[in-house]
């Protein structure tokens, strides 16, 4: 069986990649616009939440700490990525690697306990148990 690679310079490969990516994004947008539900008489100034119209207008900013939960997720998700890399090399790391991983997990657990006691994980502020 012969060689299946084609000689191509990096600029052409980048151009092909960008063109294909833009084409896929454009196709997704066109298909989504074509498949979406057409709503006649819809008011664009009313927020749409689960198909239910709001009972009363919003009075001020919504207290939803999505960004805080997302940031905490990213921080603690990095723990999984780092520990996966450690698990791949666990045999080569030996006991010292195991101790380092245990210290790493311990520090992250202390950070989680601190955030929990500080109330950073409470969705509604002021409702302590």
Swiss-Prot record:
Gene: nuoA
Signal peptide positions on this chain: none
Keywords: Cell inner membrane, Cell membrane, Membrane, NAD, Quinone, Translocase, Transmembrane, Transmembrane helix, Transport, Ubiquinone
Cellular component GO terms held in the UniProt record: NADH dehydrogenase complex; plasma membrane
UniProt keyword Cell membrane present: yes
Ranges in coiled-coil conformation: none
Catalytic activity: a quinone + NADH + 5 H(+)(in) = a quinol + NAD(+) + 4 H(+)(out)
Quaternary structure (record): NDH-1 is composed of 14 different subunits. Subunits NuoA, H, J, K, L, M, N constitute the membrane sector of the complex.
Domain of life: Bacteria
Family: Belongs to the complex I subunit 3 family.
Membrane-spanning residues: 14-34, 67-87, 95-115
Topology class, membrane: Multi-pass membrane protein
Compartmental location: Cell inner membrane
Protein source organism: Rhodopseudomonas palustris (strain TIE-1)
The protein, known as: NADH-quinone oxidoreductase subunit A
UniProt KW NAD keyword: yes
Record GO terms (molecular function): NADH dehydrogenase (ubiquinone) activity; NADH:ubiquinone reductase (non-electrogenic) activity; quinone binding
EC number: 7.1.1.-
């Amino acid at each position: 069986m012969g060689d299946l690679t084609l000689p191509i310079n990096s600029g052409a490969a980048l151009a092909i990649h960008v063109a294909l990516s833009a084409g896929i994004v454009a196709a997704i947008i066109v298909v989504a616009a074509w498949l979406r539900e057409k709503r006649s008489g819809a008011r664009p100034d009313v927020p749409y939440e689960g198909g239910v119209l709001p009972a009363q207008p919003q009075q001020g900013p919504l207290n939803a700490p999505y960004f805080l939960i997302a940031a905490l997720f990213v921080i603690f998700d990095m723990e999984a990525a780092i520990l996966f890399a450690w698990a791949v090399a666990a045999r080569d790391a030996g006991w010292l690697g195991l101790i380092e991983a245990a210290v790493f997990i311990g520090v992250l657990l202390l950070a989680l306990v601190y955030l929990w006691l500080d109330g950073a994980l409470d969705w509604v502020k002021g409702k302590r148990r």
